[in-house]
């Protein structure tokens, strides 16, 4: 059942191979979306709230225990893994989870850090993961974090960003300082925008963009700035940030070659996703 989605390639991969064995029912307010990217089995044109209210009148409560068990089996069979001995994006997110005991509100920007935040923080409550999904809105997360902290002063609020995304809206740290909104800004800093760096390598004589000193930047705006280059340094930095009661920027220096797994190659189907082990076995 597809509700208000447009079947973009970020969701379907190769649209011709998407959910070939499924019956697809699409609900959308715009008739032009029907059968546009994926052929559907049935379509319902209407306001989603009205349609879902009508559907709920006819549906019985479902027991999803069997499906939840199956998902758990998949997680055990295909666990998320990463290199445990160095500071990395997955480690940073898992450590945030450990120190906040899963009770924080997490916001993200767009990119690798966004995927790691979704994969390695165990969300158990609604409205605790604020992200723009596949919309690609770099700069969204810090503003979302300020709003969340203003509305829920009792919660630890962390914006997880990459160095590129943070630069899109980093001036809002000054807003946090001015209004004393104690958000924790974690920058997973791999020093690159992957696609931009590729163009710089191929077409601009390897003249790469410079990386900003985020610690000095935070201090210039009146916030605490902390740099972490090891796991122990990040543990200490985040513990300090939680106890400080004022805006903090933690600059986490990670390897530029760290990748998110699994992934789907351009033009491939979702069923053709691969990970690092698959590459090594080729």
Annotate each language-model stretch with its function.
Residues 51, 200-239:
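Conserved thiamine diphosphate
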Residues 10-11, 239-282:
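Glycine/aspartate-rich loop-and-adjacent alpha/beta segment that forms the canonical ThDP
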Residues 40-52, 171-188, 263-265:
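A short alpha/beta connector and helix-capping loop motif
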Residues 2-70:
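Glycine-rich, acidic loop regions that bind phosphate or pyrophosphate groups
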Residues 72-149:
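Active-site diphosphate/adenylate-binding microenvironment
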Residues 3-8, 115-193:
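Thiamine diphosphate
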Residues 34-42, 127-131, 168, 196-207, ...:
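Short beta-alpha connecting loops at secondary-structure transitions
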């Amino acid at each position: 059942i597809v509700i208000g989605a447009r079947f973009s390639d970020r969701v379907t991969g190769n649209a011709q191979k998407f959910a070939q064995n499924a019956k697809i029912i699409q609900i959308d307010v715009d008739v032009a979306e029907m059968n546009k990217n994926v052929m559907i089995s049935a379509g319902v044109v209407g306001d989603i709230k009205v349609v879902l209210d009508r559907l709920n009148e006819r549906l019985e409560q479902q027991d999803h225990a069997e499906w939840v068990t199956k998902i758990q089996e998949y997680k055990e069979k295909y666990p998320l893994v990463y290199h445990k001995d160095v500071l990395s994006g997955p480690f940073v997110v898992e450590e945030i989870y450990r120190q906040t005991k899963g009770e924080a509100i997490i916001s993200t920007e767009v990119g690798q850090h966004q995927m790691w935040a979704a994969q390695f923080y165990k969300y158990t409550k609604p409205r605790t993961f604020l992200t723009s999904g596949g919309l690609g809105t770099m700069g969204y997360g810090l503003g979302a974090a300020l709003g969340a902290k203003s509305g829920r002063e009792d919660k630890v609020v962390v914006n997880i960003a990459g160095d590129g995304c943070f630069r899109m809206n980093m001036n809002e740290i000054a807003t946090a300082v001015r209004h004393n909104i104690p958000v924790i800004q974690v920058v997973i800093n791999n020093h690159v925008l992957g696609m931009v760096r590729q163009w710089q390598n191929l077409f601009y004589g390897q003249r790469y963009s410079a990386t900003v000193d985020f610690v000095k930047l935070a201090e210039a705006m009146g916030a605490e700035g902390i740099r972490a280059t090891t796991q122990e340094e990040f543990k200490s930095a985040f513990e300090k940030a939680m106890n400080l009661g004022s805006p903090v920027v933690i600059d986490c220096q990670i390897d530029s070659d760290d990748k998110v797994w699994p992934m789907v190659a351009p033009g491939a189907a979702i069923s053709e996703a691969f990970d690092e082990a698959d590459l090594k076995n080729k």
